[in-house]
Amino acid sequence: MPDPTAPAPAALSDAEATVRATVARDGVHVVHFWAPWCDNSTAELAGGWYEVVARHPDASFTFVTVWNDGETGESTLARYAIPERVQRLVVPGVQPPKGERRTTFLGLPLTWIPATWVFNRNGQLATAFNYGEATPAQLDDAIAGAASAWPH
């Protein structure tokens, strides 16, 4: 029975509600947090995200733009040929000072971008790259691991 004295959970943002519904579906789901002003985010896009998406047609991909004044950064995604099949979401809010970039998403800490979370076919977080760029090989391995029969 829930504790009646516990504080009520914070309401989910539209982006969180959409991601929660996405990862609850059967399959492997990749959720990528980024911002177009972030050099590490754009370096990671240039490093091969288009190819990773192309190699994994059975996985879903969601790019969540954070700390960017509510803008998606669509022109940056287009510059790096991120395909339309990648879902684009935005968490509203301005870019906070570097020391204050701490938030949660689905109750999990999000303190750095880029960050990439890979959910397995059971909707459970299987791999999290939380502090910077992930290589295409690391992403491929994480997606393969999330798709495997091993119960993460």
Where are the predicted features?
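Thiol-/selenol-based redox modules, centered on thioredoxin-like
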Residues: W112-H152
